[in-house]
């Protein structure tokens, strides 16, 4: 069964900017206008949704903000969703994207390295272990050690011109800077420059 992501980007003027100390949040854009991909890999790192293994998610299941905008609240209430959460631009901009998001080697992901025409290896993105390598993993590391987390840290398997190695994934591996979240983060950063880092946030929930 597939899962879908819903939500609203919200902002508010800097409190006190127009004389009012309490400024309500306003809906800026429905998330679907900026992000529509079923990107389970990034959802696991951000919200611990559709995770294939234990991940130290950044903003898991925080619930909807108490002061959510009326428009976003109506949408969230009308939809029987789950895993409601949110994050501000300040929180997002303080993330160490190079930090590991799992406790040790991933039991699911491996790093794929491709051989260049010159013969050197260049790292590519993360991928699940190809089915063709299951037998090779059993032969190389033992029948009970097919999961990459059970390989030696320097273990590797070859498939054609590609090499697969175990990896402790970083948040940036699961949420690439040029991935589906780029438009969302770009807009949030622009709004934060205008209204302040604490006055821009994304509210999300999931269906399915």
Which functions belong to the PLM regions below?
Residues 1-196, 207-208:
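Acidic (Asp/Glu-rich) sequence patches and key acidic residues
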């Amino acid at each position: 069964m597939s899962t879908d992501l819903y939500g609203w980007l919200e902002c508010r003027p800097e409190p006190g900017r127009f004389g009012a100390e309490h400024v309500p949040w306003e809906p800026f854009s429905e998330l679907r206008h900026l992000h529509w991909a079923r990107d389970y890999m990034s959802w696991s790192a951000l919200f611990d949704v559709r995770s294939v293994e234990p991940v130290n998610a950044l903003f898991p299941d925080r619930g909807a903000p108490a002061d959510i905008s009326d428009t976003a609240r109506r949408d969230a209430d009308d939809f029987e969703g789950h895993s409601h959460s949110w994050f501000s631009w300040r929180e997002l901009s303080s993330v160490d994207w190079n930090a590991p998001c799992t406790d040790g080697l991933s039991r699911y992901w491996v790093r794929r390295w491709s051989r260049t025409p010159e013969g050197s290896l260049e790292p590519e993105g993360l991928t699940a272990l190809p089915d063709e390598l299951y037998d090779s993993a059993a032969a190389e590391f033992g029948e009970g050690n097919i999961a990459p987390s059970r390989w030696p840290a320097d273990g590797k398997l070859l498939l054609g011109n590609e090499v697969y190695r175990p990896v402790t994934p970083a948040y940036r591996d699961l949420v690439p800077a040029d991935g589906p979240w780029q438009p969302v983060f770009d807009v949030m950063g622009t709004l934060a420059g205008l209204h302040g880092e604490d006055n821009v946030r994304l509210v999300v929930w999931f269906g399915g």
